[in-house]
Amino acid sequence: MGKQMAAKYDHLAVEKDRYQTWIEKGYFTAGDMSKTPYCVVIPPPNVTGKLHLGHAWDTTIQDILCRYKRMRGYDVLWLPGMDHAGIATQAKVDARLKEEGISRYDIGREKFLERAWDWKEEYASTIRQQWGKLGLSLDYTRERFTLDDGLSKAVRKVFVDLYNKGLIYQGERIINWDPEAKTALSNIEVEHKEIKGHMFYFKYKIVENGRELVIATTRPETMFADQAIFVHPDDDRYKDIVGMHAINPANGEALPIMADDYIDMSFGTAVMKCTPAHDPNDFALAQKYHLDMPICMNPDGTMNEMCGKYAGMDRFECRDALVKDFEAAGVVDHIEEHMHQVGHSQRTGVIVEPYLSKQWFVKMKPLAEEVLANQKIEDQKIHFVPERFEKTFTQWLENIEDWCISRQLWWGHRIPAWTNKETGEIYVGMEDPKDPENWQQDEDVLDTWFSSGLWAFSTLGWPEKTADLERYFPTDTLVTGYDIIFFWVARMAFQTRFAMHDRPFKDVLIHGLVRDNQGRKMSKSLGNGIDPMDVIQEKGADALRFFLTTNSTPGQDLRYDETKIDSSWNFINKIWNAARYVQMQVGDERPTLDTKTLSSADKWILSRRNEVLENVTKNMDRYELAMVGNELYSFVWDDFCSWYIELSKATLFSEDPKVVASTKAVLYTVLIDILKFLSPFMPFVTEEIYLDLPHDKESLNVETWPEHIDFEVTQDEIEEMQMVMSAIEAVREIKSTYNIKPGKDIAVSLRTDQNDFIALSDDAQAILTKMCHAQNEAELHSDDLLSRNIEHAVLTCAMNDLVDYKEEQTKLLKEIDRLNKEIQRASGMLKNPGFVNKAPAQKVQQEKDKLAKYQEQLALTQKQLSDVEQKL
């Protein structure tokens, strides 16, 4: 046996140093060729900082699946790794340089990359420590990084192959442009915020007839790049001016007036200016009508030489100056305040500019079509859990646009394309040009999602034909949030299909976002973020893990709730105390279960244990972790602790040594299986308890999943135990209601619905007597009877001389008076607008909860009073 368990559960003591031992023992290293492989690749966290609560949730789900599969006999590879996170990391390193009073341009590209690698090593170490604190069963011998040599080779090969097949090209498109970072952004790097702006209505004079058109815009600074004015062809107000020209008040140029059914006749004045280089919709119109696409803004967000006297101004400074000049010139018709969604750079915080730029693109339609075709083939499709997210996935692929993959950064995979300095020829290849002095490599790097899109196979050694790639690809399960289905899951799907002609994973388990207790997304701006390491310090990793995975179903958001984490901690404490009790009974010797000497209570708890095994296994295989957790909570708290342990306190004092031995064996067997069931959820405390009990293996990490226990039991035996337990609850409730001392003997009679007496077995009668001092009798000699419907029977109690009904009436009337006053007080507060509108929402809800509780108690007390008064 291990050491004597501590009197109190201490999560800090239990979790200290345990993880390092597991890693040193190699419990999580994959490679047992005798077993069926199961592979999960971790969604690589960015090396930009510490893990947040969403990471803790995502990785805990994966860890539970991997630990479960190991116990089921699989060779599990859970592959860890991290993402270089292009713009995010570069922004962090830039900020650190700024603190030193320098910029990346001062030190140059090579030195900057050295600093970025230093950053990566610093934060990779932090992330590994956090993984350890969470207890994640990762195979660190296979850890990867999106910029390591192997992955860089994979990235280069996919780029070259796509290019050679005509699926990568250079072209001009409207992209998200960050004027501060001076780079293109992916959609996920743009946060849309509702801000108060203005809608400006300006007058444009028609050249041919002098009529004035009023046109609205939110971005006057882009007017210098206007190329046309559009109206709807069916709009009678403007049919006669199509083909004419109107003067652009910003620069005096005559703009052609054109017609297109894209224009919404019900919006504003139904006249739209077209600025092709600064708006994606205008860009599409310009392509359709072959309009020029001049750019009026520099990459840093200042106005260029097109803008005359406004050249050199910041874009927003230009806006203000231009509007002021328009007002002086009488060009402004009117200005309205306008709430609208505006994209901001996630990294620098500046407003993103839709911007025409020459970039590298992936031609998406052929790649998407191949994925969509394979989604119709059962053994090739990606299965989504929940299924509804497959529609989200396929709809996006069906409407996909070409993907801008170039970024104007230094940190990342540099694009393997060179331009010949003399001829302008483009070379793209796996090897650098043999005469590098004659070639200029593209300065840009690839979008971070390009490399992370290869994660499912590049991490296993591709493009080399490695043993791991052969054994573990395609991977089995990806766990990720619904917010990156487009950005990551879809990209993994089409890049893997292109490179490997296969799916990246068989299943995708989708979870939601972690929100605060008010349902708000956690963010720095709201200051409502929670550091999982703080929670672990205060409550332990096991409590956090159990909370995260048992309070949300697949695809749903999770609300962070400290009271539920407390509940998880209390549950673990309950297990700890139960284990201490079992340890004290069992001692050093591992008891052997003899299924031929089982009591009624033994058979009942083992039957429940078998039911739980079946349900838990089924739901684990379905990814229904919350259902598993809730079932285990109920089984441990209610069945094992509240019932079987209490029942055992009677049988352990039996004079029959076989009964005592059987009770000890069942206590031990069920507890060990509880530890196995819960070990994927709470690995630290289950390991601690396991090692403190007599045990078969050196660690719970190498234990096997419980199996069905065969023993002889009839349905009648199970129903008798259920009936007796229900009878005990009913007798206790009656004694409590009528203030009868718990130790007072009471005569009861158990009968069927047809009023036939139900005789109990000796086991069952002994339990009834021990647990509630009740004796089951065929005849009750009493004129004061009280009945309750219980499970499988009707229970009748002989109440003679046990209750002073007059005294009970007085007590109940007093309680009813108290409850009425509380209800009146709470109702008054909730009818007070000053309280409801000004008090914190949590306080108002507490008062509502109190009112509901008082009303429920009042109804119950009034029913008790009615019962008592019938006896008077």
Task: Please report, for each region that a protein language model flagged, where it lies by residue.
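Catalytic cores of large soluble enzymes that bind and process phosphate-bearing ligands
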Residues: 6, 10, 14, 53-57, ...
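Secondary-structure transition/capping motifs at alpha-helix termini
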Residues: 67-75, 96-109, 129, 133-138, ...
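Feature 926 captures the class I aminoacyl-tRNA synthetase adenylation module centered on the KMSKS loop
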Residues: 201, 395-450, 454, 498-541, ...
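Active-site-adjacent bridging/hinge elements
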Residues: 34-42, 64, 100-103, 128-135, ...
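Short acidic-hydrophobic surface loop/beta-edge motif
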Residues: 200-206, 244-249, 343-347, 418, ...
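Short Cys/His-rich metal-coordination motifs, predominantly Zn2+-binding knuckles/fingers
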Residues: 181, 251, 348, 420-423, ...
